[in-house]
Amino acid sequence: MRGISWDHPRGFGPLPPTAAQFAATHPDVQIVWEKRSLHDFGAYPVDELARKYDLVVLDHPWVGFMSETHCYLPMDELLPRAVLEDLAAHSVGPSHRSYEWDGHQWALAIDAATPVASYRPDLLARLGMHVPTTWQQVLELGRAARAAGMRIGMPLGPVDAISVFLTLADNIGGQPFATTGRVVSNDVARSVMDAMRRLAELCDPLDYTLTPITLMDRMSTTDQIVYCPLAYGYNNYSRAGFRPKLCLYADMPSLGNDGPKGSHIGGTGIAISTKCQWPQVAAEYCAWVCGGECQRTIYFDHGGQPGHSQAWDDPRVNQLSHDFFRNTRQTIERAYLRPRYNGYIRVQYEGGAMIQKCLRDNGDVDQLVRDLNDLYQQSLGGNK
């Protein structure tokens, strides 16, 4: 069988070793893994991947499209109910149910992630400051960092811009997409864009081009970036020796009064294409690689970021990752699950570009809301 994941040690590193271990007990099975870019992970049509690969690691907003195009096999038709119930019971936050749609489970949560805070403990100590828990404290840290010749940072490319926008909207009780035909109210949008603008003033213009990976690569190789309030977590950077400078993670800071609530859940799921000639064997591999024993051992040990709560609770896993999982658990358990209907991918990319442009150009927020609502309405027609 052929599988495809995405190009980062977190996304690809564990898969060849897990395939080799699975083959040791299934000598007639060989799984060859390939990788695609982070951008293609979110944007490349998953129906095209299904024509070429048996196993695909993908993003959960695709599940509505998957359901309508029938290019993947429902896991609930391949695995015993007890297996799926166990995985659901050991989900961190809404990771497992993010792959449910129209009465079926389209993928299993092989990886779990959500926007959280990251920081350099040595640089924070140099400033004599603590990890922020509120947005106001983030801004205070940003001003102190700038005065010391450093800065805070945050990836503000289109996909990350909409991630931050929806995270902060939900954090202040804005309930994105809860009202028919509306992304958020004008008042919520104004509050969120004001918070994002005040932060962007303390960041580098380069942040508009950064992804969570490129931002963390800068934080972990230079002494420029002290702290980032919101970006998808990568536990690799909090492991000794992964990069020259150790970075740590913490729960997201709150803009509202309800703590670390509303983070825009991400992570990845593993799915089986309809072209797979050995779906039962593929499902057995998927269930094993997403299960607690594999996730807290070989999967984590080869750079993965588990989606199973047994790994998140494991003392050894937390020790080796400087408590990445323990220190971000509250955020992921209270994460926001974005829409997943067929067509939402368009909102993610085009809407993200609208938010980024409004932020960068100090645009009119009420016009942004109108544009987002129009895009939302158009997207309900599905991916064309």
Segments (PLM) and residue ranges:
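Glycine-centered hinge/linker elements that transmit conformational signals in sensory
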Residues: 179-210, 252
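A ligand-binding cleft/hinge motif common to bilobed small-molecule-binding domains
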Residues: 61-67, 229-245
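Long, aromatic- and glycine/proline-rich binding clefts that accommodate carbohydrate-like moieties
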Residues: 300-350, 357
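Extracytoplasmic/periplasmic solute-binding protein
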Residues: 106, 139-182, 225
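Short helices/loops that flank or line small-molecule/ion binding pockets
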Residues: 41-52, 69, 123-124, 143-147, ...
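Extracytoplasmic/periplasmic substrate-recognition and gating elements
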Residues: 240-302
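Conserved N-terminal structural module of periplasmic/extracytoplasmic solute-binding proteins
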Residues: 1-63, 375-384
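Hinge/lid segment of periplasmic solute-binding proteins
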Residues: 63-114, 247-250
